[in-house]
Amino acid sequence: KVFLMSDAVVAALPNQKDASGKTMQGMLDELVAAGVQVKLCQTCAWARGIGELPLIAGCSLGTLAGLAQDVLQADKVITL
Protein backbone atom coordinates (compact mmCIF):
# COMPACT_ATOMS: atom_id res chain seq x y z
CA LYS A 1 0.00 0.00 0.00
CA VAL A 2 1.09 3.56 -0.74
CA PHE A 3 -0.39 6.58 1.05
CA LEU A 4 0.51 9.97 -0.43
CA MET A 5 0.51 12.92 1.97
CA SER A 6 1.17 16.66 1.88
CA ASP A 7 2.38 17.92 -1.52
CA ALA A 8 2.86 14.33 -2.74
CA VAL A 9 -0.89 14.12 -3.39
CA VAL A 10 -0.42 16.04 -6.67
CA ALA A 11 1.54 13.04 -8.00
CA ALA A 12 -1.80 11.25 -8.47
CA LEU A 13 -3.01 13.88 -10.95
CA PRO A 14 -2.64 12.81 -14.59
CA ASN A 15 0.43 14.08 -16.52
CA GLN A 16 2.57 15.17 -13.55
CA LYS A 17 6.30 14.93 -14.40
CA ASP A 18 9.46 14.91 -12.34
CA ALA A 19 12.55 17.03 -13.11
CA SER A 20 13.89 14.48 -15.61
CA GLY A 21 10.63 14.48 -17.56
CA LYS A 22 9.57 11.02 -16.38
CA THR A 23 5.85 11.01 -15.71
CA MET A 24 4.62 10.28 -12.24
CA GLN A 25 1.62 8.66 -13.90
CA GLY A 26 3.84 5.98 -15.41
CA MET A 27 5.28 5.10 -12.02
CA LEU A 28 1.88 5.04 -10.32
CA ASP A 29 0.37 3.04 -13.20
CA GLU A 30 3.07 0.39 -12.66
CA LEU A 31 2.27 0.19 -8.95
CA VAL A 32 -1.47 -0.07 -9.55
CA ALA A 33 -0.93 -2.74 -12.24
CA ALA A 34 1.10 -4.72 -9.69
CA GLY A 35 -1.85 -4.63 -7.30
CA VAL A 36 -0.57 -1.88 -5.02
CA GLN A 37 -3.32 0.17 -3.37
CA VAL A 38 -2.55 3.91 -3.85
CA LYS A 39 -4.43 6.36 -1.65
CA LEU A 40 -4.12 10.10 -1.17
CA CYS A 41 -4.64 11.94 2.09
CA GLN A 42 -8.11 13.38 1.63
CA THR A 43 -7.39 16.33 3.93
CA CYS A 44 -4.17 17.13 2.03
CA ALA A 45 -5.94 16.89 -1.35
CA TRP A 46 -8.74 19.23 -0.30
CA ALA A 47 -6.25 21.70 1.22
CA ARG A 48 -4.50 21.88 -2.17
CA GLY A 49 -7.73 22.29 -4.13
CA ILE A 50 -7.51 18.94 -5.90
CA GLY A 51 -10.11 16.97 -3.94
CA GLU A 52 -12.58 16.95 -6.83
CA LEU A 53 -10.12 16.62 -9.73
CA PRO A 54 -9.83 13.35 -11.67
CA LEU A 55 -7.04 11.09 -10.42
CA ILE A 56 -4.91 8.49 -12.16
CA ALA A 57 -6.89 5.26 -12.53
CA GLY A 58 -6.50 3.10 -9.44
CA CYS A 59 -5.73 6.01 -7.11
CA SER A 60 -8.32 7.19 -4.61
CA LEU A 61 -8.77 9.46 -1.63
CA GLY A 62 -8.15 7.95 1.79
CA THR A 63 -8.52 9.12 5.36
CA LEU A 64 -6.02 9.47 8.17
CA ALA A 65 -8.12 7.02 10.17
CA GLY A 66 -7.70 4.52 7.32
CA LEU A 67 -3.96 5.15 7.28
CA ALA A 68 -3.77 4.56 11.03
CA GLN A 69 -5.62 1.26 10.59
CA ASP A 70 -3.22 0.20 7.80
CA VAL A 71 -0.19 1.08 9.95
CA LEU A 72 -1.52 -0.93 12.89
CA GLN A 73 -2.09 -3.98 10.66
CA ALA A 74 1.21 -3.76 8.76
CA ASP A 75 4.23 -5.92 9.50
CA LYS A 76 6.52 -3.16 8.24
CA VAL A 77 6.05 0.57 7.53
CA ILE A 78 8.44 2.65 5.42
CA THR A 79 8.17 6.44 5.51
CA LEU A 80 9.88 8.63 2.93
Which residues make up each language-model segment?
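Short internal beta-strands
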Residues: 1-6, 38-42
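Short active-site-adjacent structural elements
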Residues: 11-13, 47-50
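A glycine-rich helix N-cap at a beta->alpha junction
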Residues: 18-47
